[in-house]
Amino acid sequence: MRSVVTGVGAYLPSKVVTNDDLAKFVDTSDEWIVERTGIRQRHQAADDQPVSDLAFEAAKEALAAAGKTAADVDLIIVATTTGDLTFPATATIVQRKLGAPVGVAFDVQAVCSGFVYAMSVADGFVARGHSKCALVIGAEAMTRLMDWSDRGTCVLFGDGAGAIVLEPGEGEGTTDDRGMLGFALRADGTKQDLLYVDGGPSTTGTVGKLRMLGNQVFKHAVVNISEAIHAAAGKAGVAVADVDWFIPHQANQRILQGVAHRCGIDEEKVISTVAIHANTSAASIPLAFAHGIKDGRIKKGDLLLLEAMGGGLTWGACVVRL
């Protein structure tokens, strides 16, 4: 039994913030941001728009694409760092908003790696017969964590949500099967100080602001993600060169290019949305996934490679045939 992606959805808040907009109140410029990150704009959620609203919209689109309704959903996993409340889980709030029946619903927090981690967990439920229709959602309002005086971080992030529907599918046990083929998940807590938020309910009692040592993160990202990519491909029984599309976490263009180059992935195979979405943390992979489907590049039967790295540090990769 494989867990098969049968629907993909995305949602972006209507407000677009350009680099020129940021340059009005922080010491930066469009040229400076583009040269270092490849980012040209990002979306920002409205003040009265919680993350569950973003997740809800992406989930509706994914369900429609899969030909399913909320009544079919028996598992919801939301990957987020910026949930509505300390508790309950944002997944339960999404469950209520969708009108889904009583089932399993919880959050996964691995920051930018969250969606890959959540996919792995959902795969375990579906492939073992514990779920017949799973929603996996990456949703973030990262702009809520920004220190708007820190030009090294505030220019990097945006808000949004993406979702996939996973359903069980029979296969022949080969790499031609549709579905999840291989995962590699990693974490190294000794690197916590490279990327974190300086707040929390049991420490400061505040939400906190995002802090990052960008150059150190870049160094670890390229090396560690590349290792995870080869590990996931090995578990899937495929070569990296066989991949049709590479859907990386949209951290910045330099990391995307660095990882692709190190792994020998042709630039034409890279789905990049960082210029228009910026870094949306756990939402970035499903947003890019949906973008590639909507523009006609990604098609049923294609072999996809997904990867991410986030605070913790956490990182991981997944090989899936659509």
From Swiss-Prot:
Enzyme Commission number: 2.3.1.180
Active-site feature positions: 112, 249, 279
Cysteine disulfide links: none
GO MF annotation list: 3-oxoacyl-[acyl-carrier-protein] synthase activity; beta-ketoacyl-acyl-carrier-protein synthase III activity
Matches recorded under SUPFAM superfamilies: Thiolase-like
Pathway: Lipid metabolism; fatty acid biosynthesis
Domain comment quoted from the record: The last Arg residue of the ACP-binding site is essential for the weak association between ACP/AcpP and FabH.
Name this protein carries in UniProt: Beta-ketoacyl-[acyl-carrier-protein] synthase III
Gene that this sequence comes from: fabH
